[in-house]
Structures are given as structure tokens and as C-alpha cells.
Amino acid sequence: MRVAKWAKAFLLTTIVLLLGCDSVQQPKPKAQLRLQYPEPKYKQVPDIYPFDFKYNDWVELKGIAKTAPDLYYPKMKATLYLSYVGLENNIDSLLNDAYQLPGKHMIKAQEIPERVFMAPEKRVYGTLFTVVGNAASQLQFFLTDSTDHFLMGSLYFYSRPNYDSIMPAAKYVERDVVHLMETLRWKD
């Protein structure tokens, strides 16, 4: 009888342990990407362009022989492409292009908020478009004095567009672009 009680207890304990060992898979929490970029220090663009502005000092200038430099962010693998055009009765077509270009990203974008920029004392007017979503370009802008000068810029990352991953870098570059817009001066 003692053996039967012991066997029953052993069998019951074994069954409970075997049934209790089935572990439920818990989803792992998603890690947040922590990117840290240096505090920006700004310096003046070379004196060979029809404009002046300040840019982040760890940015590399590319295509200096062009009418506007491209700003390459090596730590982010991103480039802010700049294009300058002298106005010759073509401001309507340039403004049309500047407003249509962000619209081409609407297929992948969730929204494209725009911020109007005006500095009448410096004759600088423009718009900054922030593309929210998995679009190829996360940021576009233009600046003009509406009579002689027109500057456009587009930000591209050298990676597959994944907004959640590149958002911290895009926000960092956006602050640099706002600083560029605020410090831009046309040369006459």
C-alpha cells in the first residue's frame, strides 16, 4: 500500500511538471535605436556662391564647382542636394516645380506638412516641406528673393526608406536646414 501511494504521488508530480513546463512564447520588446549626433557648430559656406549661409561643421561639402554645394552627412549616409538658379522671368515654373516635387512622394508619404519662411529684411522667402513616411526624400525646401535668386534643396539617405529608422537623423538634418534658411543671405 505504501508503494502504491508513493507511485501515485510520483506519477501525479511527474504529470504536473510535464504539463507545467510548456512555456508560452512572450514577444520581445522592440528596442529603440539610440543615435547620437554631435551638437552642431556652424561655419560659413565658401565665398564662391551667389549666397552665404552657415552649415554644420562636420558636414562635408561635395560638388563645390557647381552653383551650389551638396552637404554630405557621413555619419548618417545622407546628402542634402542643393540647386541654385538665377531668376530670368522663370520664377513661376521654378515655384511650380518646388511645390510639385514633394507631391511626387505622396504615394509613400503619410503627410507632407509645410512651413513657410519669411525674412523680408534679408529678402529671403521660402517653404520647408517635411515628408512623413517611407518616401525617398524626407525633406525638401526652396528659398528665393522672387527677383534674382532661387535655391532648392532635397535630403536623401543612402538606404532603403524606413521612416522609423531614419527619423532621428532626418530631424537632426531638419534643424540644420532651418539654420541654413535663417542664416541665408543673397549676394548682389
Model-derived regions: residue spans:
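Bacterial signal peptide processing site
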Residues: 22-25
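Post-signal peptide N-terminal segment of mature Sec-exported envelope proteins
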Residues: 29-50
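Bacterial N-terminal signal peptides that target proteins for export
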Residues: 2-11
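C-terminal motif of bacterial Sec signal peptides marking the signal peptidase cleavage site
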Residues: 17-20
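Surface-exposed amphipathic alpha-helical segments
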Residues: 59, 154-188
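Signature of long, low-cysteine stretches enriched in small and polar/charged residues
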Residues: 60, 99-154
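Secretory pathway targeting signatures of secreted, lumenal, and periplasmic proteins
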Residues: 48-100
